[in-house]
Amino acid sequence: DFPVSLRYSVVSKTKAWGKGAMPYETDFEEFGRDMAESEKAVKYLEEAGYDMFNCDNGTYDAWYWAHPPQYMPDNCNLEYVEHIKKFTNCPVVCAGRMDPVKAAEEIAAGRLDAVAIARQNLVDHEWIHKILSGREDEIKPCIRCHNGCFNMAKFKGTANLQSMDDSLHLARCALNPTTMQHNKYKIVPTRNPKKVAIIGGGIGGMECALVLKQRGHTPVIFEKTNELGGLFLTASAMSFKENDK
């Protein structure tokens, strides 16, 4: 006998086959499971023996509720998950772009039992320790790009050719090459420290400086402007790219 958790979609957020609902759409007929059905279903599932509900929203036709990309708002499933908690005695967990500060508030208030964090752990393996030790400014944030963890990278119209039978394809990160590939991209301390000049302070230049520093070298970036970031300063200008900044 062991505890059994169910990943439970509270509401389907689906308008028709292949047509998911967006966050701003509230006046539509639910094609899948609505809240009234969900309130009954969670009780049936509890009676069937499930011990915990790890909750989000959505279906394959509205996948972006369960795995929110950068276009979705933070805590997008919170309202629905907190509502369904009222209808079960099992622990209820909320997933989906959970802000850690908001998550802590809701758990402390008893409106949630826990939150589920996945992608943030791929980009920064020490993020929870940094929060606990008051080092939030050191956290490398997930930008919700899905290019590494979901194998969705595109280049000039060509899909990522990474084989889907690769067991690691959902455990990689576009921002952290060492995630599940630490043997391939292991950062090895140098035995011959050098002072290294890096021309350009864009994303590539900054990452180069970071790795060189971690290896024990002394990197120096030469940037022609008074800002680091290069073209990514423009690329991250949209309001929904707050973590890119």
Set out the residue ranges of the language-model regions:
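Flavin-dependent oxidoreductase catalytic cores
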Residues: 1-199, 203-214, 218-219
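N-terminal glycine-rich dinucleotide-binding loop that anchors FAD/FMN and/or NAD(P) in oxidoreductases
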Residues: 234-245
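Glycine-rich FAD pyrophosphate-binding loop
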Residues: 217-233
